[in-house]
Amino acid sequence: MTHYILAIDQGTTSSRAILFDEKGSRVGQSQQEFPQIFPDDGWVEHDPEDIWSSTLAVCRSVLKDTGIDAQAIATIGITNQRETTILWDIDTGKPVYNAIVWQDRRTSGFCQSLSDQGLSEKVQEKTGLLIDPYFSATKIRWILDNVDGARETAQSGRLAFGTVDSFLLWRLTNGKSHKTDATNAARTMAFNIHTQEWDDELIELLGIGDVLFPEVMDCSADFGVIDASWLGAEIPVNGIAGDQQAALVGQACFTPGMVKSTYGTGCFMILNTGDKAIRSEHKLLTTVGYRLNGKVTYALEGSIFVAGAAIQWLRDGLKLFADAKETQSLAKQALNDDSVYLVPAFTGLGAPYWDPDARGAMIGLTRDTSVADIVSAGLRSVCYQTKDLVGAMAQDGATFSSLRVDGGMVINDVMVQFLSDLLEITVERPCVTETTALGAAFLAGLQVGLYQSLDEIEVLWKADKCFEPTMEKGTGDKLYQGWQKAVDRVRTRD
């Protein structure tokens, strides 16, 4: 009998459900986009009910489309957009405010005040993170301070906090399970990555001590059982990881020194550092790669806020094309893309700049600039930002000769080839590019015995195509210098 794993991949712009067999082969998939809410400059929100309804819809859809009975699903794995913050009343199950998305910059002033108080060192030492609006803790504080009744609900012991995984788990189990995993907890700025516990000192300093925090589990664990009313059967949830850490597992980067980069709404490069929590001196993040059987594997991460979101903006905002698939053919038509730069700092700049007040710019436009040139500049902006991260990792002592890539953008051969040319290394694209969902499936499968070890998972990884550098030496460096000048023009801080 075939054992199936249902992977829920709740992302920034869409929710997906992917059904895998135990060999890691995709059996079926369903995806549904949901609205983005932009109430103010630099603010990004989601309606938690949209997150919930779209997730439930795709789970039901993939079962219907494949004809597979819910009884045949051995386990569920959840992976999710990280840092996005939801607070809900445990009595009603209803959120008290919209989900504040990881891209949201509304708390930049509060973050600056924390830095001015001299807390940067303490925060980085305990959490591995920099003080930034990106992370969950200051979003919690904003809701408590600005939403009528939120602090009173918290003080009465009824206000639960969760990242998206925790919120979905609560809903799926009808409020029986308030849990998260170590990778999601590590992105809140309230979790001590060394003790692997919520940090009471930071929580009190941030003024969020009245909120109910979820129990932190290994990435493979018994998180709870979903109510039969949702999919027609009681199914255990046995794997949870934030999307980028799930991709690290899906890419089988289990050996220290292995690195992957995921290209979705944003871009996230993660380097496995083994049992050592390496502190970056160049504005990278020290984080949890995964935690299994109580043992933590640490990672060094560079986070870019806008990657695929730049292409989405070119499509939906500027209406330069109707479908993202058109970008490959358009990029091939570009004639002036060497001189056109798009800096997609729509919600500030992430690593290694960490400038929340920077804003986007398009530089080098002339009367000859075409749609193809602008589209190519959008694709290249993702590669230039990746090189920013590679440079920061190199300064922290990391060396690597290859990079594993995944996510929706990497089906674009033109972009991936330019990435290889720019970095001057081999870039490997796996057969399964949606490795985020695959990683969640692997983690769930580990817990229920479908896989006995990470070694067993590693042999399932297969490369679809390896891209080797073809650009004339020195050309990439010249192009990158142009990028650095463009970035300097939008930065507001050193």
From Swiss-Prot:
EC annotation from Swiss-Prot or TrEMBL: 2.7.1.30
Binding site for glycerol: R82, E83, Y134, D243, Q244
Enzyme class label: transferase
HAMAP family in UniProt: Glycerol_kin
Cellular component terms (Gene Ontology): cytosol
Binding-site positions, ADP: T12, R16, T265, G308, G408, N412
Sample GO molecular function, one term: ATP binding
Protein's gene: glpK
Gene3D superfamilies: 3.30.420.40
UniProt entry keywords in alphabetical sequence: ATP-binding, Glycerol metabolism, Kinase, Nucleotide-binding, Transferase
Binding site for sn-glycerol 3-phosphate: T12, R82, E83, Y134, D243
SUPFAM superfamilies per UniProt: Actin-like ATPase domain
One Pfam match: FGGY_N
Activity control note: Inhibited by fructose 1,6-bisphosphate (FBP).
GO biological process, one term: glycerol-3-phosphate metabolic process
Pathway this chain belongs to: Polyol metabolism; glycerol degradation via glycerol kinase pathway; sn-glycerol 3-phosphate from glycerol: step 1/1
ATP-binding recorded as keyword: yes
Family: Belongs to the FGGY kinase family.
Keyword Transferase: yes
Lineage: superkingdom: Bacteria
Name used for this protein in its record: Glycerol kinase
Catalysed conversion reaction: glycerol + ATP = sn-glycerol 3-phosphate + ADP + H(+)
PANTHER family, A to Z: GLYCEROL KINASE, SUGAR KINASE
